[in-house]
From Swiss-Prot:
Protein name as it appears in the record: Integration host factor subunit alpha
Pfam families (alphabetical): Bac_DNA_binding
PROSITE patterns linked: HISTONE_LIKE (PS00045)
Function: This protein is one of the two subunits of integration host factor, a specific DNA-binding protein that functions in genetic recombination as well as in transcriptional and translational control.
GO biological process: DNA recombination; positive regulation of metabolic process; regulation of DNA-templated transcription; regulation of translation
Length: 108
C-alpha cells in the first residue's frame, strides 16, 4: 500500500486477506474500530495504540491572530484540536531503523 493514500476500503481489504473474515465483516470491523476512536476523541479521551502512537485532544486558548493579507488583528476563539503523536517504534519503522534489536523492516 506504499506510495498512495490508504482508504477505509483498503484497510477492509487488508483485514479480509490477512484475517480471513468475510469482506462485509472486515468492513464492519474497520468501521467499528474507527467509530470507537472517534467516540473516545469526541469525549476528550486520549487513544493510545501501542507501537503505533497516540491521538490526543488538546485545548487551544483564545488568542490574537493576524490576517496575513491585511495585517488586521483578529481574535481567534478557544478550540479543541486533535494531535497524533507517533510512537518511537513507528518512527523507527518509517525511517528503516531498529528498535530494541528488532529489525523493523521484517514482517512481524
Amino acid at each position: 500500500m506504499a506510495g498512495k493514500t490508504v482508504t477505509r476500503a483498503d484497510l477492509s481489504e487488508a483485514v479480509y486477506q490477512q484475517v480471513g473474515l468475510s469482506r462485509a465483516e472486515s468492513a464492519a470491523l474497520v468501521e467499528t474500530v474507527l467509530a470507537e476512536i472517534c467516540t473516545c476523541l469526541s469525549s476528550g479521551e486520549t487513544v493510545k495504540l501501542s507501537s503505533f502512537g497516540s491521538f490526543v485532544v488538546r485545548s487551544k486558548g483564545k488568542r490574537i491572530g493576524r490576517n496575513p493579507k491585511t495585517g488586521v488583528e483578529v481574535e481567534i476563539e478557544p478550540r479543541q484540536v486533535m494531535v497524533f503523536k507517533p510512537s518511537n517504534v513507528l518512527k523507527a519503522r518509517i525511517n528503516g531503523g531498529h528498535v530494541n534489536g528488532l529489525d523493523m523492516d521484517e514482517d512481524e
